[in-house]
């Protein structure tokens, strides 16, 4: 039960998602509010990615934390090919956090996202239309902290930043 003034933390796993959504992060996490019987039905609707965004009008998380210590880059949402980006993504803007999360999945080699600029994805586009968060890279800032001093982390973040700049609608 959601109560007024309640703080909500959205804590999704980082994963690819076969079918319409292509990835499942905080915006898709809100779909958990829908009754399980109705969630199954939505998987057979061509506008699934767009419909899922409308459930996000029910609530606004105070914080989004995506566990990217591991992520699925193929298959999903229940199993798939694993990678270990070893990142945690946190923020108060679920669109911005999902754009970064999807960019990490893409950087890890996901064929589902390989040729698909994140900002042009239907799920992100609908979230922007609904005013759920950042409308483009100018509305977000990526701050990083590498606890290990890893060259792999630096290369990953460089790639993620590049991907977050692609495919921004005019």
Residues of each region from the PLM?
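Extended, low-polarity segments enriched in aliphatic/aromatic residues
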Residues: 1-170
């Amino acid at each position: 039960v959601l109560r007024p003034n309640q703080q909500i933390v959205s804590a999704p796993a980082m994963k690819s998602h076969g079918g319409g959504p292509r990835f499942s992060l905080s915006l898709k996490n809100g779909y958990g509010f829908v009754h399980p019987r109705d969630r199954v039905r939505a998987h057979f609707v061509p506008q699934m990615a767009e419909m899922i965004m409308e459930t996000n009008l029910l609530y606004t998380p105070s914080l989004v934390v995506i566990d990217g210590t591991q992520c699925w880059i193929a298959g999903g949402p229940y199993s798939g090919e694993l990678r270990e980006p070893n990142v945690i993504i946190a923020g108060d803007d679920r669109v911005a956090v999902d754009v970064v999360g999807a960019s990490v999945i893409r950087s890890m080699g996901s064929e589902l996202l390989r040729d698909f600029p994140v900002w042009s994805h239907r799920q992100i586009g609908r979230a922007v239309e609904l005013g759920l968060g950042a409308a483009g890279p100018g509305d977000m800032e990526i701050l990083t902290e590498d606890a290990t001093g890893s060259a792999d982390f630096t290369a990953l973040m460089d790639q993620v930043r590049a991907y977050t700049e692609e495919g921004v609608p005019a």
